[in-house]
Amino acid sequence: PPELAKRIPFPGPALATRIVGEVTEGRLEIVREATAIVEKELEKSRAFQYMAVLLNDKATGIRENKREFGQIIVVRCINSVDARTATVTKIPWNKLNRISKRITSIKGVNRCLYDLTPKPPATIEYI
């Protein structure tokens, strides 16, 4: 059926593959929330695949007038026919801005990046 054949691919080991570095319950919750945002915002993009990835590094930021060292989420949205090569999906600035605001509202996240790297040299997934 089309709903299965045309669905966005998702890795077998689930959300753990969207976390670079140690996988903990807290980090799983962050990537789970970010994934829900990305999927809702990009479901009509007609992209081959889109995802939120939690990096192993942290970034300095400011929240409520206090300095914080927060998590970094990368949003990746790509177009492909066969998954052997892929190009970056051009997403309107206002949508990227909304995604960034929503993701940085997740507790502990203060940075949201959009990955502009095609395949090759990158792969579709991070891990």
What are these regions (language model features)?
Residues 1-127:
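ATP/NTP-dependent adenylation/nucleotidyl-transfer catalytic domains that generate, transfer
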